[in-house]
Amino acid sequence: MKRIFLKIAVYCLSAVVMGSCVYDFVPDSSDLQGIEKPLVVIEGDIIVGGMTSVALKSTSPVLGGIEQDGISYAGASVWVENEEGAIWQGEPSQESGVHVVDTRGLSQEGRYRLCVSVPDRGEYRSAFKQVMVSPPIDNVSYEKADDNSCVQFEVSTHNSASAPLYCRWTFTEDWESNSELTAEIRAKYKEGKVYMEDIPEEEREEASRCYSHGNSTGIYIGSTEKLSQNVIDRERLHTINATDKRISSLYCMNISQTAMDKEAYKYWEVTKSSISGTGGLFAPMPSEIRGNITSVTFPDEKVIGYVNVSTESVKRVFVYAHELNMFKRNCNGVLYPEEEEGDNVWFSLYFSGLVPIRYELKENGDPDKSQAYWTSPDCVDCRIFSNSSRPAYWPEGR
């Protein structure tokens, strides 16, 4: 049988839509049936008492060295329904392929499923599931490595019930992605010459204070099944290196916790193990844990995804750079004269991609406009690497 390679672009985490991950893999022979067409990927849990976000993605088959088109979800509809037939209709969000369903009014006593209708593909449904109640997040802590090379973030929770606790976590991040240096001047080129001009104070502020946003891209799960107590203590979420700009000023993590049953936990456990062990989200898995979504229109069609039904516990934590005292700054300015031995040094620096920061100062404090400090652009303009605006919840004065 012809070997078919797939490039998978899927959203790795649900509830809050996560950043995409791409994996290359070779399916086993049983997975090749019908794989010439892209597979539907449905990602998102039903959040009882909150907003449900569902990402519609697809695999992209690569046949004969040519990557085939994925599935178009134009005109798709998403809804949640209970066993009595009541429907909560979703709406497309601003992000392509993402639909949002208002499930704040759902009762914890009901059983619910997710339904998706895709033009030219048919209807897809997850299995009805009861609502799992997530306990509160007890604490989000962090611990610095002994060599100060990184900081590790951890989450703790517990359940007073006797049944084992199965949890999954996702998180979003916001941080001040400020520039390490502030430029007071900039270089301009005109008629074969490089000259300097002052940067207005307002523009200096815009270039020196920025904000960025990120989403978790891993699978974070925990269980008390094999523990003597129903306590998940300091389960590691992720690690940030000491040179990462996320911890250069003020960092915030918004953590979402959902509870799940053993079946859902097993799905994510094997998926996580498969990714780390073979490099592919769709490495061979036992058929009984492929997911809980089926095609109503074509029952034999393979669908990727697992829809859990749970309440959501959230916690937000702020970490200031001075609390960690570990961010390693890499930016410095180097002093260069305008001319040296008849050569225009600034001309060469300008066309090398470097930028000026400020003039050297004379003994009396006045600027020496024949000498200036230069550095790389990303050291003085945080807009180069920022991707967001100031969050509404950000502390005043920041």
Language-model segments: what does each one mean?
Residues 17-20:
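C-terminal motif of bacterial Sec signal peptides marking the signal peptidase cleavage site
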Residues 22-398:
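A sequence/structural signal for flexible, mid-protein segments enriched
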Residues 1-10:
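Bacterial N-terminal signal peptides that target proteins for export
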